[in-house]
Amino acid sequence: MILTWATSTNIENSLIDFLRNEVIEQALQILDVNGVAKTVNVYAGRELNNDWNLPLIQVYLDSKPDANRLEIGSNKRLKSFQVIIDIRTLLPGQETNLADWVEQEINDGITIYDYTPNSLNPEAPAKSILGYGRVDFITSMPVPSYDDADVFDKNRYRLTIKIWMNG
């Protein structure tokens, strides 16, 4: 058996796909210091990549804090997956506005897909609906900036969410 995507990766990728689709659908942009509109980018990964372009939404799975049994004697569980969403923008105040937008978009939950490799096009894995993820907000707050912060850390906001799934 070749292990490809597990539930954790499916949840992370489903959230990323959802946000990317919403950005495209709404043609979401933010102004830079010169008043030029910049499209919001959505990236995956815990580590910051210097090749990424601001403004951005960074998404990664943090932990799996809950796995409660659904009923006595059952092996079915209600699992939660804690996800970090870091928002990094070009100008002060934009990070809060973009965080509000993200909260509004994911408030009703997201469809979770089961991804499988596509040998013909590795950049576009096949997907089928795995279930629905309920979203709970754990924290929503600006990340304090420090004096010599680089461009990626000056205007930053962090959302911590739990996505719940039966399984």
Protein language model regions, located:
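Generic marker of residues within folded, mature protein domains
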Residues: N49, N75, A149-V151
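Extracellular/virion structural assembly segments
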Residues: S74-L78, R88-N121
